[in-house]
């Protein structure tokens, strides 16, 4: 084993770990960094405490743990153990734990000091998964504030060293050149005249006919794997075994794919990018690369994820090609042109830039971090995705202002995705808890095969769901209870209320409570139900409507009876412009779905006024009578908040005024019963009465409506939301004014638009003194010739102002 490439840099690495808190290791696939190096660090690294090795994928974690234990002549659970979702194999003597990403985050949250841990190794960091970025940010925070003795080793096959070194400028970089056999890289675009699955199968069969050895075929997703597998069944020889490999396969099936082919056989492993790194698949010397991958991209506008098929990066192509040279010289056939490959992005985009960040935000708030920018990230989480995450957590009642609510803390402690955590935390009885646990297990690993009816799926017994359900029950500290299908709708509604759906028309089309559209296949039996709740949705690329992947029929009356907080009643108003009247209605809604509408026959004045306010909020402030005087007062208040921020000026933007109608408009509405009388309201008076007397006085003093110029003329000042105040005045009327007037306690100069006798602009200035002493001379010279009957003195700052020409002066 010492012949492994990474062995050559072991002394350098061990020295770096002794002298630096963070170390970067760049070692290509097959160098031994996952399956050999951790044992050497354990034996020779003088690490004070356990070692945690993070592997992104469950299959890789299990295999790495198995391999490391075998090298010690042991079984997992002794010196080497592993932890992953729904399965733990560690013992009292375990000193090296291989864990998956979510597990590491939970360990840090439960014990921020990582008591008893001396080193954390982040493997395959180049994949830049969301959880790996979060783990790095948390670990750096732990090192800085709690454990300056904790060591961190970041290792990868294609480290983005420049970015990491900017983040960790003091970290030593250890580079292992690796040992790969030569790989012949071929490039051949697929035929445009064949279906993708058929064209891939033809290319694979052709390569198998001319070359020996087993093959690894990279495809973007499960659908392509299944279709290409069908095509290959008829095209390959009898000695070829076809093995699918993707993350949703049961681990037992995944392990079959990576075992050596039986004697006299060879195999084709049809894999997603799960096989790019970590996994060693025995006997592979041929790789066919579709050069495509399927990526989940979150849409913060809809709150849904869309699966996008895209070209892989050049780094991923290199990784895939490298799989052909692990054991002997090999061949990699890329199914695209060489020029196309050279135009591909150099590196894959990190998950944090295009993912749903609600789970990350929940973790950060549990950590006590209210501003993500306070942590060290390779890429800052996008603000728009964080805003969408915050909206979801608010809808789930997880927040109390900027912090987690008591319910949010209960959610965070469970360690599940936020919606599932909310559903689990909402369970009150043992029966509800076990029902929620089974639902969560199903939604984490949904069945394949196209069955959408969640009720039918729930009735199934599946070992992985049962195992996961039991683990979740332990987290909830619950025992006993029986799964009850009758509780499903209420539990789902506690986390997916925005995905309650009502049928619209035929052919499986529905509207969701969040206003979006959703659909089933036209022949799906669920389509006969008027109401569904669809916890699992996927945003399609061909239609604006989301596709329901799992949905449950609900009786809406029973659901509201079980969860009355879902339904909101509101009084709204309809404007009858022709009659000048208002019609008030009471609507009962779930989100944007109207359950019931009833007229308010004889509403009281208070009810009618509230309905009017709701109508104004619905239609906007434009339905009110904004006179120039009212608009000017609103602008002055806006400017006062900017120029005199130390005072508590009321906010007058649209959103704030709509939110505070009861405070400033309602007191003026006595006797208002119709649209005509509503539009007659004096909004200037309403806003002025809203101001406390001291602020009203200060506004009139510091931001006056008019300014009296030297001639005595009282001229209106123009206020603007983004610019200083302005005054248009004939230049002769400003003679004798030496300096520019200032407002807002001397902080804001008045912009003077100095006009000719014909009221045309001559000069715009906010420094009158400089103008009189400077460019006025040129204006004077020109104006004397054009307006000889008017006064153009040599010393305007001290001259007498006038409204008239020389004849009348």
Spans of model-derived segments:
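P-loop NTPase motor module signature
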Residues: 1-423, 483, 538, 722
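Extended active-site and interfacial segments that coordinate phosphate-rich ligands
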Residues: 111-126, 290-294, 303, 315, ...
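Charge-dense polyanion-binding interfaces
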Residues: 121-122, 240-241, 250, 254, ...
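Short capping micro-motif at the N-terminus of alpha-helices
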Residues: 520-521, 585, 717-718
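C-terminal accessory/binding modules appended to enzymatic or scaffolding proteins
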Residues: 686-748
């Amino acid at each position: 084993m010492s012949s492994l490439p990474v062995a050559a840099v072991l002394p350098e690495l061990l020295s770096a770990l002794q002298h630096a808190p963070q170390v970067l290791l760049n070692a290509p696939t097959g160098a031994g960094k996952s399956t050999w190096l951790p044992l050497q660090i354990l034996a020779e690294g003088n690490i004070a405490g356990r070692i945690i090795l993070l592997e992104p994928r469950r299959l890789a974690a299990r295999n790495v743990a198995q391999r490391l234990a075998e090298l010690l002549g042991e079984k997992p659970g002794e010196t080497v153990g592993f932890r992953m979702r729904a399965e733990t194999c560690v013992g009292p003597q375990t000193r090296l734990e291989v864990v998956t990403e979510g597990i590491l985050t939970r360990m840090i949250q439960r014990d921020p000091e990582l008591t008893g841990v001396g080193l954390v190794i982040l493997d395959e960091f180049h994949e830049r998964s969301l959880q790996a970025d979060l783990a790095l940010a948390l670990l750096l925070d732990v090192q800085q504030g709690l454990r300056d003795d904790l060591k961190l080793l970041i290792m990868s096959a294609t480290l983005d060293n420049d970015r990491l070194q900017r983040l960790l400028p003091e970290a030593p970089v250890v580079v292992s050149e690796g040992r790969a056999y030569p790989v012949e890289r071929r490039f051949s675009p697929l035929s445009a005249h064949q279906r993708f699955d058929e064209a891939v199968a033809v290319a694979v069969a052709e390569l198998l006919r001319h070359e020996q050895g087993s093959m690894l075929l990279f495809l973007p997703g499960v659908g392509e794997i299944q279709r290409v597998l069908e095509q290959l069944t008829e095209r390959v020889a009898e000695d070829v075994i076809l093995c699918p490999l993707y993350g949703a396969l049961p681990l037992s099936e995944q392990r079959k794919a990576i075992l050596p082919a039986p004697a006299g056989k060879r195999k084709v492993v049809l894999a997603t990018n799960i096989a790019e790194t970590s996994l060693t698949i025995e006997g592979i010397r041929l790789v066919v690369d579709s050069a495509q991958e399927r990526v989940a991209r979150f849409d913060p506008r809809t709150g849904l994820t869309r699966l996008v098929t895209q070209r892989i990066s050049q780094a991923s192509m290199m990784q895939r090609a490298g799989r052909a040279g692990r054991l002997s010289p090999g061949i990699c056939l890329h199914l695209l042109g060489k020029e196309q490959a050279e135009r591909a992005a150099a590196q894959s985009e990190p998950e944090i830039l295009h993912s749903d960040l609600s789970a990350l935000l929940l973790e950060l708030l549990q950590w006590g971090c209210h501003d993500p920018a306070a942590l060290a990230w390779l890429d800052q989480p996008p603000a728009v995705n964080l805003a969408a995450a915050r909206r979801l957590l608010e809808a789930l009642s997880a927040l109390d202002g900027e912090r987690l609510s008591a319910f949010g803390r209960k959610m965070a402690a469970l360690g599940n995705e936020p919606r599932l955590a909310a559903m689990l935390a909402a369970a009150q009885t043992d029966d509800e808890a076990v029902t929620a646990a089974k639902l969560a297990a199903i939604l984490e690993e949904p069945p394949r095969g196209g069955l959408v009816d969640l009720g039918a799926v729930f009735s199934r017994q599946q070992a992985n769901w049962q195992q996961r359900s039991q683990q979740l029950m332990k987290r909830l500290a619950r025992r006993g209870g029986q799964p009850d299908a009758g509780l499903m709708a209420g539990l789902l509604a506690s986390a997916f209320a925005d995905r309650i759906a009502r049928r619209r028309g035929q052919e499986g089309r529905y509207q969701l409570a969040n206003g979006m559209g959703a659909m089933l296949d036209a022949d799906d039996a669920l389509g006969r139900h008027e109401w569904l709740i669809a916890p699992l949705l996927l945003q399609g690329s061909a239609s604006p409507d989301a596709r329901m992947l799992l949905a449950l029929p609900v009786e809406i009356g029973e659901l509201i009876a079980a969860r009355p907080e879902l339904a909101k009643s509101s009084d709204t108003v309809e404007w009858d412009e022709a009659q000048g009247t208002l019609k008030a209605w009471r609507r009962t809604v779930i989100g944007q779905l109207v359950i019931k509408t009833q007229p308010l026959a004889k509403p009281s004045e208070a009810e009618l006024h509230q309905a009017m306010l709701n109508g104004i909020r619905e239609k906007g402030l434009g339905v009110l009578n904004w006179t120039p005087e009212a608009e000017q007062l609103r602008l002055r208040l806006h400017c006062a908040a900017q120029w005199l921020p130390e005072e508590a000026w009321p906010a007058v933007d649209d959103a704030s005024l709509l939110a505070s109608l009861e405070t400033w408009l309602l007191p003026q509405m006595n006797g208002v019963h119709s649209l005509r009388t509503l539009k007659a309201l004096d909004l200037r008076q309403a806003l002025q009465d809203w101001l406390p007397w001291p602020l009203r006085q200060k506004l009139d003093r510091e931001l006056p409506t008019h300014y009296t110029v030297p001639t005595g003329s009282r001229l209106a000042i123009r206020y603007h939301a983004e610019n200083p105040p302005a005054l248009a005045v004939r230049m002769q009327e400003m003679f004798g004014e030496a300096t520019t007037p200032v407002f807002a306690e001397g902080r804001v100069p008045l912009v003077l638009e100095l006009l000719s006798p014909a009221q045309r602009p001559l000069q715009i200035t906010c420094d009158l003194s400089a103008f009189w002493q400077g460019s006025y001379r040129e204006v004077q010279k020109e104006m004397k010739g054009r307006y000889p009957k008017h006064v153009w003195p040599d010393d305007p700052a001290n001259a007498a102002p006038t409204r008239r020409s020389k004849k009348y002066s």
